């Protein structure tokens, strides 16, 4: 009878530690999948960023071409005003690109992802502003 109790107690002890170990493995797997999700979010963001950057670079090139040529649609005063506004937006964009690189580096070192989404919003707003300027001055 005593041997049965010892065997039963040993069995439940092993069962307890085995279930505890499994829950630890599950916990670490959950953390790994959460980290993977963060990496996927960063990768998706970076892909969007690259797409927006390419789109903006295309618009920038078109706009600079219009600034360089004489265009009857745009009177000189409008052209000057647009050029000032455009160059200011372009400057903002370049600063955002530079700060974005710093944020991505910071984020890879364990920083918060919040800054990335704030920058994405700022980048989107800058793109909208440049597109508005482009439409306003008939640059489509």
Located regions from the model:
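N-terminal alpha-helical modules
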Residues: 22-140
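Enrichment for repetitive, rod-forming helical segments
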Residues: 11-12, 136
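N-terminal signal peptide c-region/cleavage motif recognized by signal peptidases
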Residues: 13-20
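A ubiquitous, low-specificity "background" feature that marks scattered single residues
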Residues: 9-11, 99
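Bacterial N-terminal signal peptides that target proteins for export
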Residues: 1-8
